[in-house]
Swiss-Prot record:
L-glutamate binds at residue 41. It comes from Bacteroides fragilis (strain ATCC 25285 / DSM 2151 / CCUG 4856 / JCM 11019 / LMG 10263 / NCTC 9343 / Onslow / VPI 2553 / EN-2). The modification N6-(pyridoxal phosphate)lysine is found at residue 190. This is Phosphoserine aminotransferase. Its cofactor is pyridoxal 5'-phosphate.
Amino acid sequence: MKKHNFSAGPSILPREVIEETAKAILDFNGSGLSVLEVSHRGKDFQAVMDEAVALFKEILNIPEGYSVLFLGGGASMQFCMVPYNFLEKKAAYLNTGVWAKKAMKEAKGFGEVVEVASSADANYTFIPKDFTIPADADYFHVTTNNTIYGTELKGDLDSPVPMVADMSSDIFSRPVDVSKYICIYGGAQKNLAPSGVTFVIVKDDAVGKVSRYIPSMLNYKTHIDGGSMFNTPPVLPIYSAMQTLRWIKAQGGVKEMDRRATEKADMLYAEIDRNKMFVGTAAKEDRSRMNICFVMAPEYKDLEADFLKFATDKGMSGIKGHRSVGGFRASCYNAMPKESVQALIDCMQEFEKLH
């Protein structure tokens, strides 16, 4: 039976990427060695790193003066590194969910944190629109897609101060005006690679301006100067990231990923809105295309476990919603084929007919 992987992350990767990575695990570049055991200082892996960085910049149209880094520690490490490197006195944060809240918590150890707006009182079911960003803030931080609650910023916001963004779950799903940001970061295990590598886009001239001492491993300049090789990088995930970037480029780049994301999300949301058994949880204007969250309608609430089993038996994997929201979550990242979304829709319609 075909499996349809709707997991929120680690998540689905393109089949071609998995196959190429599997080949490299057995024999990397005809070397007779596995990519798991080659030196990160060798010319073969340096070529992988160089290509991954070049493709990253090309696909996102990153301007001159920015570096792309592949680091460890996940987005959670970036919650600390961002204020360590950029927060001198005050930073502004938009609180749209658990991950934004965690980022704010870390930043409070480095200076004043202004929460410009929050949707916590509504369990983060919408993204606040009416707020003022302090003109004297060192930066304004946003989380562009909220995996738990199924909300997404529709494009780049305007800000009177430099912006920082956690794009863990929607990177490469749409065009981005990188020039608006001094830093964009994210865990790669949604739209880019297996878990274990973190991507960071950082504006070179924004680094080195805070007065505090920054430990070497937490200093962006260290990793810019070292080409992401100050310490041993996560070799295998970077290799897979390079293969994913090749795939994105071959498929038509972020414009095509954007088109596909909208098409897949529109299909599933249309069924959620049509089907009497299901209800979407996020405000319609803020609905995420990456993480589609829904619950059983109140009169069918007692059938939630039944639908989960029914869907699982039909090959749907990873659709159980986060514990803070409940219900279901279908994550439709770039590698998710339209056919899998249709399979979930068929499953929902079949369940409806049975009840």
